[in-house]
């Protein structure tokens, strides 16, 4: 377990919109950038464009288009700017097969090809039910169906999907949050038997049509009721483990570090069943305001705390070795509410208004944390003169010791832009020319030479500005940055 150390182009016509992109300025982002860490600024992290040829650990959500909760064409032009390698789509059985046996994939073709055109690999969550099969009397929204006419129709549909997108879609995820669906016995959280059967039958069809594509199971959020364990053991009993490449999880806790122990337990479970199966964070994100529905509702979020939360969650997953997908690219209009999880804020007409601070934060992550970066398990925090918990892990680049990521944790991210000046000592890392990278602003700061001391065991740094948002201390020659200030 990672140690939590206790130490101390329609929108352009709208009034007030400016900029070449036709987007409003983000007032919050301007305030964040106007109050950087109290250190000299040397430049900014160099961002990367999404590129099919470049490996990536990061994904962004492009979900709910199967239900028209967003308009793909209104935001696809911004997706490549994020630098992510992947994007999650939902397949929309009901939108594709409106008459039994008649498939219209034009809408999904547009999204798959659009992402590829932006340099992003699409991965596809196969879901949900289809009302044209409702004559069985089964709930065909997110409910999981047993063997029978619905399953037969579903498997035919899946075969058509996989056959059509072979060579384009990199991974199929079977269903979304099945632990939220009521099973035949009506007890929420006990749908694992029905789900396991659905997964195995679906995965067999996927593998028949595309032997090389990856397959992910579960996309579940329930860590406390044995859902993952019960499902994987049932999948194993049904002979489905050879089809399982990933187990995806969703996590929405106001204090993101609470996920660490659960993910480590899930990784251990997967390893005990088949070490080949890896854990992937498939959907997590933070609202930008107090929401009255959906995940992490009834909490006073802002665009400040949102950006910090998403950065912490991304860095936690990196430290755990989990590729990660951020929910979601834009605010989603459910009709009864307009969600605020988006990297881009949208209006009620699903038109983009401005890039939230979260957008720029994710650009900083994708620009730095490429597959050349890995966790350095030899680095640890040995002393700190503060009285709040710290999350700390070391990083390597191309196998060489590079630096450390650290932030103050233990509480929900705040709206404050204040940093605390802290003295720390790190063991297992001897930094010769380190710089300070603010993962939120992207500013690369100089560390005063007199404040950095290399010891036999590691490195000590005096008066280091720290806060409840990730900071990267890294060797200068291992970070790519511009001279922009």
Kindly label every feature range from the protein language model.
Residues 382-430, 470-472, 478:
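Carbohydrate-binding surface patches
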Residues 425-445:
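Solvent-exposed beta-hairpin/edge-strand motifs
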Residues 286-369, 376-389:
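Aromatic/acidic polysaccharide-binding cleft in carbohydrate-active enzymes
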Residues 135-246, 250-269, 290-310, 429:
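Active-site cleft segment of glycoside hydrolase catalytic domains centered on the general acid/base Glu
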Residues 56-62, 87-89, 122-126, 170-174, ...:
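Hydrophobic faces of well-ordered beta-strands that scaffold small-molecule active sites
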Residues 4-13:
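Sec-dependent N-terminal signal peptides
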Residues 446-485:
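C-terminal beta-strand-rich structural cap/linker in extracellular carbohydrate-active enzymes
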Residues 22-160, 173, 179:
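N-terminal substrate-binding region of glycoside hydrolase catalytic domains
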């Amino acid at each position: 377990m990672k140690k939590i150390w206790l130490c101390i182009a329609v929108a352009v016509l709208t009034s007030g919109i400016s900029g070449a992109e036709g987007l409003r300025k983000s007032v919050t982002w301007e305030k964040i950038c106007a109050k950087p860490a109290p250190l000299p600024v040397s430049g900014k992290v160099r961002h990367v464009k999404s590129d099919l040829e470049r490996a990536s650990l990061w994904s962004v959500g492009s979900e709910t288009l199967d239900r028209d909760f967003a308009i793909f064409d209104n935001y696809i032009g911004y997706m490549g700017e994020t630098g992510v390698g992947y994007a999650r789509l939902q397949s929309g059985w009901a939108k594709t097969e409106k008459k039994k046996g008649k498939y219209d994939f034009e809408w999904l073709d547009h999204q798959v090809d659009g992402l590829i055109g932006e340099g992003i690999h699409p991965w596809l969550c196969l879901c949900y039910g289809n009302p044209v099969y409702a004559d069985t009397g089964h709930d065909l929204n997110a409910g999981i169906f047993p063997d029978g006419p619905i399953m037969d129709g579903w498997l035919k549909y899946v075969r058509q999907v996989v056959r059509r997108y072979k060579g384009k879609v990199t991974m199929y995820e079977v269903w979304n949050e099945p632990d939220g669906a009521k099973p035949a016995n009506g007890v929420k959280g006990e749908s694992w038997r029905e789900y396991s059967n659905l997964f195995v039958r679906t995965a067999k069809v996927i593998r028949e049509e595309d032997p090389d594509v990856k397959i992910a199971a579960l996309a579940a959020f329930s860590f406390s009721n044995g859902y993952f364990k019960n499902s994987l053991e049932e999948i194993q009993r049904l002979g489905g483990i050879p089809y399982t490449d990933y187990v995806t999880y969703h996590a929405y806790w106001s204090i993101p570090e609470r996920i660490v122990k659960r993910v480590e337990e899930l990784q251990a479970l997967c390893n005990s069943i088949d070490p080949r199966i890896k854990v992937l964070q498939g959907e997590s994100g933070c609202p930008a305001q107090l929401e009255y529905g959906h995940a992490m509702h009834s909490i006073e979020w802002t665009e400040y705390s949102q950006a910090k939360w998403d950065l912490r969650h991304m860095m936690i997953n990196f430290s755990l070795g989990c590729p990660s997908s951020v929910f979601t690219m834009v605010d989603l209009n459910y009709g009864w509410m307009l969600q605020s999880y988006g990297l881009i804020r949208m209006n009620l007409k699903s038109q983009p208004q401005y890039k939230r601070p979260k957008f720029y934060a994710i650009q900083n992550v994708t620009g730095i944390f490429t597959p050349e970066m890995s966790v350095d398990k030899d680095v640890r925090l040995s002393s700190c003169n503060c009285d709040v918990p710290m999350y700390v892990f070391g990083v390597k680049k191309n196998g060489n010791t590079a630096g450390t990521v650290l932030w103050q944790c233990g509480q929900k991210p705040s709206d404050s832009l204040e940093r605390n000046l802290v003295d720390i000592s790190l063991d297992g890392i001897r930094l010769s020319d380190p710089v300070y990278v603010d993962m939120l602003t992207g500013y690369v700061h100089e560390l005063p030479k007199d404040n950095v001391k290399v010891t036999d065991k590691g490195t000590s740094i005096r008066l280091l500005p720290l806060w409840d948002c990730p900071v990267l201390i890294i060797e200068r020659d291992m970070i790519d940055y511009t001279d922009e200030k």
